[in-house]
Amino acid sequence: MIKKIMKMAKIYKSKNAMIDAVPVIDRESKMFLQYPVNSNGCCNFTVIDKDKDFFSNIKSTKSNSKFLQEMFIDGTKRKPYLDIEHYYPSEKEFKKDFKRIIPQIVNDIIQVFAKEYDQVIKLSDVLLLNSSGQSSDGYKLSVHVVVSPKNKTFYYTNSKKIENNTAYHLYASLININSEYKDKENFNDKPHGYLDEQVYRKDATLRMIGSCKYPTGDRCLDPIDSKTLEKLDLTDKQKLNYLISYIDDTKPTILLETPIIQQTTISKTKIQHNEPTKTNINNKLLDLVKKYHPSAKQYGSSKEGYYNFNYDNRTEKCPLSGVTHDSNGFYVIEKSSGCFLKCYSKKCHGKSMHLGYVDETDQFVDEAHQINTKYLLQDPLVPKLLEDWINKGKTFAIKSAMGTGKTYLIKHILDKYKLNKVLWITHRQTLTKSLYGSFKDYGFVSYMDTQNCLYQYDKVLVQIDSLMRIKEFDMFENKQLVKKYDLVIIDEIEGCLSHYESPYLNKPDIDSRYIFNFMIDVIRFSNKLIVLDADISIRTQLFIEHIDKITNKGGNYIMINNSYQPITKTFTITNDEGDFDTKLFADIKAKKNICVVSMSAGAVNKIAVELNKMGTKYVSHTSKSNDSLKKNLEDVNNFWKQQQVVMFSPSIISGIDFNEIHFDKMYCIIKSGNKTCDPRSFLQMVGRIRHLGDQNIFCWYQQIPIFIDKTNKIIPKLQSDVYTFDDLLSYYRYYETLRNKKIIKNVVYETVEGDDVISFVNKSVEIDLFDKISLHNEVEQLNKHQDVFLTVLNRLIMRAGNKIDFKLVLKDDKKPIMDKINNREEEINIMIDLDDSKYDIKELSTKQTNNQLTEIEKLFIKKYYFKKKLGIKKEIDKDKLRELMTKYMDKEYFIERYEILFGYKKISDSNDDSKTKEKDRIKRKIIVDFVNILIGKHYNNCLNDSKLKRIIIKDDQYSKALKKIIKESMYFSNEEKYRPLFRKKKGSLKSNPKKEKEIQFYTSTLVRLLREYNIILKVESRKKTNGKSSYLRSLSVDKQIKDVVENKYNHQ
């Protein structure tokens, strides 16, 4: 058959080449086909005329050599269709369920047509193609459904989820009727569903009538009667009805209109409903794998970070080669285009199979316009799409690796389309400085260079923190005025959306939610929007779809996915500090040009000390660096190439594009935990350097999570459970029940549009985009935990097409090269010696706003606000101040926790956003509950510190209280939901409180949580009687913090 087609029509090696070869006006008259050519998933593509002689052209439908698949090109007509799949352990169970489920689904389809489309169809209008049969581990139900009446044709125009008039609507409607049809997220915990969601996407494909499974040639798709379920013998003319993309225009054709709000009901369920997550990436992968290896089990990960699998039933045929293997397992590698299965057998070397998607954004990206080019403007499709966007689109989104010409693309847009009013939103000062250096000749004004209201300027670069400066208040008409911009640009959109989690956005009169919703309204009334990034997550997807919805564009956003991958990098990660330092300084002494990317500012300072001794020319950028360095970032290429060593901390995550061929090698220092950046931001830091002489990046990660296997081999933990959106949403919905108050809410504005300005009036609803993005931000922050960080980092490295390797030791025996220095102690000594009378805080605040502070001035501001936080208004002894700074500097939150827990300050008086305030109230409630149980009191919201000076708890009293805490306390009765409040890793205590040795895990948790709130539970004494030990314990507040707080409030 395939040879016949090759004689009749041109064969294409890529889908896009085939599609582009057919003018849009001609596509409805063609049949688009693909067929596999080898076991690694490669296909050829062809186009033939869509006419009544289709089957006579391809001839016999019984040959096992046929593997044709229909392709439904986006924008062309296709009939309603479904793909039914299910697995059974035996043929008996298959036959029993087959007779039940198929008639049930057919009847539900008839119901959907009546209810959703107001169309009456009969049983005979629902056509069935059966490919069910024996699989390697039981029996598989496989039936394709096509709704194709003889006297008329129903059709949709696409198969994407987020679109009008889509075939996905039938699937969504059916699983709304019966949740049994939907695949469950965890393959192992619940029965598999029946309807396959994977067949609904851009340019979807399905096997056609008579087509067989590749490469075995078995289980051909045969027509069966929808009533008797018996096999049918059809003529070529009758078979045309079973072709999904064959639309007979001689019959009446009816478009099935499907509003977006209806079709997306199911796909958005995860965001709307209070259901905790039931899976993690490992379970999702196992779900995908079991479709091809039903007896598969996961066995950890390889050194390269791949996911290893094996299978029990050795009669299962390898899906790559069609042969059986006696012992070989297989593995899955995750890329940005999805998950691919590969086999360890030499017989399958070089072969792979695309399994599907794990990340929720993968399909969204896959449905974008696909290009593969080193520089965006080199692809002829890009200028064409720009024209389409200018003529009829709102949003232009680009996913493209760093260094692929996104900046030049924006210059091209500004040059060609002469857009007069442009707002460029940033999230980092370094990004703003770099962009200003590149675009100041276009007339842009940087918010960093003016203190005035930005409303008067037509082209503005502004950081989110200062976004409110673009509006002007009309005091005469009592209105706020905002320009209607021709274009809004958000470069590095992921970082921008993540920035809304910053606590610095929350002020007494405004918070991050308000700023975010203001940004959305500005974009809504602008003419055009561009968003760009090297990576796109669910946050950006939600953002793009929301803008599309509120501007009534209905799917008119244009997105480009540039799959071009620059040179592959290999990240070699070690926990051997001595080896890392040895290699680093050996390269510096060899006069190599080195870049050090560090997640720790302290590590940068430590290296700087050694470089000063060596007389090495270097520059380091941290948050504490002199602000004058930021000016040099406007011409970073010229500035950095003058240095032998360049070091930077997370103060430079985005915006810098160093394009010179200068650096020989890169070294990285990785740090996990709450006080540093997330894995995505770390890789953004690495990406600032576009060219490296050596693509092998050596990384030191002291906290790397490991375990020792039976052979004493050190194994990195790459598959820890991660927090998900569903986790956080379910926890917040639970928290809301505690106080009967909404935490996740919606604040929107009623808008009044004028010719050049917009005015806003507040209005409330129930849930909004900010909450969705905020929860995803919080997930990202929680997954910085030491046990989870590497799991996320490994995924991101693999998805980017890079490699990861490990060089681990049990103990670092090497003598340190660098002297031990205490950066914090040195910093405190400098602050102690500063003469406060020589500094004017108002003047320094102005310099801070203008980015003109020196390192010493930054330290004075830090000292000033530390003393203010502790209520120190008068001169204080230097030794006393040093003692306080040593204990509480950068830990001032302990003071505020004390103030709130003991009633000195209200939570409502803090500058946190409303969500954080509600979390603080719940945490306070948990601590109060612990104390009440321990001492037998009934405090409500606050404790009394005067009565917690030193309460003695006898052994019997403590034992009873501990048992009650484990069984009944607010925290331990639902620990899994409260862990994220205290930034603990996902999971719950598995210890058995009935076993004495395991009670210590509950005890340590109790002691630690109380200590975080300045309450000390400790053993005062131990007594042994008749060989049995008893303990006397005490509960008290931290006396030093108590004294600080009392002093602060006594002098107000």
UniProtKB/Swiss-Prot annotation:
Its EC number is 3.6.4.-. ATP binds at residues 400-407. GO terms for molecular function: ATP binding; DNA replication origin binding; helicase activity; hydrolase activity. Disulfide bonds: none annotated. It comes from the Viruses. Keywords: ATP-binding, Helicase, Hydrolase, Nucleotide-binding. GO terms for biological process: DNA replication. Pfam families: Herpes_ori_bp (PF02399), Herpes_UL52 (PF03121). InterPro entries: P-loop_NTPase, Replication_origin-bd. Residues 389-561 form the Helicase ATP-binding domain. Gene3D superfamilies: P-loop containing nucleotide triphosphate hydrolases. Belongs to the mimivirus R1 family. This is Uncharacterized putative helicase R8. It comes from Acanthamoeba polyphaga mimivirus.
